[in-house]
Amino acid sequence: MKFPQFDQEIAISYFSDVKNAGQIRNELLSGNPDYQVAFINANTLLSSKHLLAAVYRAVSDQEAGSMKTKNVHSEVLFCLGGNNNIMDSLRRFGIQDDTTNIVAVKIGGGEYTKLVEGTEEPFTDEQIAKNTDIKLVKKVYKLPGTVSLDDRAQVETAAIGALLLRGFS
């Protein structure tokens, strides 16, 4: 896919039953150039719209020369966060050694699906919803008690608003 305003090709895949999250994480931390991919803990995502808002902001920041991180893939993780703390966003939205559901985002083309030992699933809102941890999302975005965990649309609106407004005062 592409956003109409930008030339970069964007590929997104959903993986379940991932067996090598620890290896992927180690490769990311070591700076292996083959791993220039945003690997996201799928349990922290609410919908495709939620992720695409962060991807759009990351690509927009890249085009404007205003990225806060080293590359556009880490910028996606940073943009998912609702605050200006890069490490906090990487920790909250990135994968851990025991992550079993991963969404991978590759911006700019290139192979990445062979890096993940898991089952590739369709990237759909239904697939995302199967594993979303609403309580975790509410905690990550520090949503007030007035936001109902039962109202997924309300949580999604609040989360997307937080990531879009990050950095504005």
Swiss-Prot record:
User: What is its subcellular localisation?
Assistant: Nucleus; Chromosome, Telomere
Q: Which family does it belong to?
A: Belongs to the CGI121/TPRKB family.
What's this protein's function?
A: Component of the EKC/KEOPS complex that is required for the formation of a threonylcarbamoyl group on adenosine at position 37 (t(6)A37) in tRNAs that read codons beginning with adenine. The complex is probably involved in the transfer of the threonylcarbamoyl moiety of threonylcarbamoyl-AMP (TC-AMP) to the N6 group of A37. CGI121 acts as an allosteric effector that regulates the t(6)A activity of the complex. The EKC/KEOPS complex also promotes both telomere uncapping and telomere elongation. The complex is required for efficient recruitment of transcriptional coactivators.
Q: Which UniProt key words apply to this protein?
A: Activator, Chromosome, Nucleus, Telomere, Transcription, Transcription regulation, tRNA processing
Q: Which domain of life is it from?
A: Eukaryota
**An example of a Gene Ontology BP annotation on this entry?**
tRNA threonylcarbamoyladenosine modification
Describe the protein's quaternary organization and the partners it interacts with.
Component of the EKC/KEOPS complex composed of at least BUD32, CGI121, GON7, KAE1 and PCC1; the whole complex dimerizes.
Disulfide bond sites: none
Question: What name does the UniProt record give this protein?
Answer: EKC/KEOPS complex subunit CGI121
**NCBIfam families per UniProt:** PRK14886.1-1
The record's section on Gene3D superfamilies has: CGI121/TPRKB
Zinc as UniProt keyword? no
Its cellular-component GO annotations read:
chromosome, telomeric region; cytosol; EKC/KEOPS complex; nucleus
Recorded hits in Pfam families, A to Z, give: CGI-121
